A protein has these predicted regions:
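Zinc-dependent deaminase catalytic domain
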Residues: 1-255
Length: 255
């Protein structure tokens, strides 16, 4: 379980024990709060989050990017009746991945359609693959008020035979957890139930932030056999010294 209390309301999410997925009680809580409350979530998430589980790199990364503070491994005990508190569950205990309302249409094309588009543009070397990622990013609608639109960021994942496994584009204008790489990894789980296989290569227009890097690393069959290529070096602390950097998995290729 993970929970946060704000102004007399306890928001909580539960996750099945022993289930492996690119999700957790913490991830469900954060994704669900943004899906329900959008920008007001930032006010709720100024408060400390608590979880009964130990933190994974995935959980740590998501908290660093969209929340503030978290305490892990708390032990529940009966405090008796807590008058004046309201309890709001985010999702239900049986859900692995929380359905989200703000996943853009650009994220819902079939793998076959995207694979066909990639296959129509011959690409072998990483620099050329990153050009194709930039092409996918151009699917994201943009406008003059940048805050109101998703960022033009895209990523795709190939297996060791060069076949497309998943893709994602940024859709975080309302739900701040829905970065391109998060969408990619969670789609892979929804459609296959399997982790990123050994020998896979992920191409992203931008360097994965700590949230995305944590989820990628968490949902790898063998992280030591993964390569991540990106072209845009993101500025700011949220993309510095990620778990992918620490394990030498990131490869920067500038345009």
């Amino acid at each position: 379980m993970a929970f946060v209390e704000d102004k007399g309301t306890v928001y909580f999410a539960r996750f099945p024990v022993g289930v492996a997925a690119p999700s957790s009680a913490v991830v469900k809580l954060l994704q669900g709060l943004f899906d329900r409350f959008v920008d007001h979530s930032f006010f709720i998430l100024r408060q400390r989050i608590y979880t009964t589980a130990g933190l994974t790199e995935m959980c740590r990364g998501m908290v660093k990017v969209v929340a503030k503070r978290i305490t892990e491994n708390i032990r529940p005990r009966d405090h008796g009746e807590l008058a004046g508190l309201q309890f709001v569950e985010i999702g239900d205990a049986s859900q692995i991945l929380l359905p989200v309302a703000y996943l853009s249409q650009e994220n819902q094309k079939s793998i076959q359609e995207v694979a066909g588009w990639l296959g129509s543009h011959a690409a072998v070397i990483p620099a050329r693959q990153l050009e194709l990622a930039s092409g996918l990013a151009r699917w994201v609608p943009r406008g003059s008020v940048l805050h109101d639109y998703d960022r033009d960021i895209a990523a795709f994942l190939l297996n060791d035979q060069g076949q497309l496994l998943s893709y994602g584009v940024n859709s975080n204008s309302k739900n701040k957890t829905l970065h391109a790489e998060v969408n990619l990894v969670q789609r892979l789980h929804r459609e296959t139930g399997r982790p990123i296989p050994a020998g896979a290569v992920l191409y992203s227009t931008h360097k994965p932030c700590k949230m995305c890097a944590g989820m990628i690393y968490h949902w790898c069959e063998d992280p030591s056999q993964l390569k991540v290529y990106y072209s845009v070096e993101e500025k700011g602390g949220l993309s510095r010294q990620t778990v992918l950097d620490q394990h030498g998995l990131n490869h920067h290729i500038s345009k």
